[in-house]
Amino acid sequence: MSLTRHEIREKAFQALFALNANPDADENQLFQQLLNPEEAGAVEIPAYLSTLVTGVREHQAELDAQIQPYLSQKWSLDRLAKTDLIILRIAFFELQFVDDVPAKVAVNEAIELTKAFSDDRSRKFVSGVLGKVVKNQAN
């Protein structure tokens, strides 16, 4: 099974969402369920899927600290929809730690994830936050 990076990001989002609800879940077993729901045997886990999920989990506190300043003063990470927070964590991780993903691609992919897993308000919110990030990086 060969997945595009877009499809891998979707699987990473699903894995991180599930792990947010159940942090003690077995990552490998979760990957197998996401990649092979028919359970016809184990499939190879794409390296980029492991990179995203493991990286976001290992750097979660750091990513959250980077996201917080981009929220308005009356908002905290706890108030964000979990879908939006996880999408932002993925985008911030790619922006900071993945050298071969241009900022424009990371932002666009995050917006595509909100289209798939959230609503229009979330899409606008995520787009606004990441727009500020890219603008700050350019300065």
Indicate where each model-derived feature is located:
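N-terminal interaction/assembly modules
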Residues: 1-116, 122-123, 127-139
